[in-house]
Amino acid sequence: MEKIRLKLRAYDHRVLDRSVSAIVEAVKRTGAEIRGPIPLPTKIRRYTVLRSPHINKDSREQFEIRIHSRLIDIVSATPDTVDSLMKLDLAPEVDVEVRSMGE
């Protein structure tokens, strides 16, 4: 059929890894060839906020959010593979981006 690329993102790497392993299991059961999961670089967003609402500019607090991501390529996807991916119940914290890559 065609090549499907899945890009998964989450703030918690443990939840992300559980979702990735569920996807890999489902795809392997259908007999499709899979490449990955490939860990992509973690994006770190840092925010600096004043601690006091009025004075003390020198007193600041820093927060950060880490966004972990993985990439999975399904090389020979069949209609069975697509059906099993649609039926998967993944964690709500995981953002899944699906792209169809032409042959």
From Swiss-Prot:
**Source taxon at top rank:** Bacteria
- Write out the GO MF terms: structural constituent of ribosome; tRNA binding
Quaternary organization? Part of the 30S ribosomal subunit.
- Sorted alphabetically, which InterPro entries does this protein's record hold? Ribosomal_uS10 (IPR001848), Ribosomal_uS10_CS (IPR018268), Ribosomal_uS10_dom (IPR027486), Ribosomal_uS10_dom_sf (IPR036838)
- Similarity remark: Belongs to the universal ribosomal protein uS10 family.
**What is any one GO biological process for this UniProt entry?**
translation
The gene name reads rpsJ
Q: Which organism is it from?
A: Nitratiruptor sp. (strain SB155-2)
Q: What Pfam families does its record include?
A: Ribosomal_S10 (PF00338)
| Gene Ontology cellular component annotations, sorted alphabetically | ribonucleoprotein complex; ribosome
Keyword terms of this UniProt record: Ribonucleoprotein, Ribosomal protein
This protein is called Small ribosomal subunit protein uS10
The family database entries (Gene3D superfamilies) matched by this protein are listed as: Ribosomal protein S10 domain
Q: What does this protein do?
A: Involved in the binding of tRNA to the ribosomes.
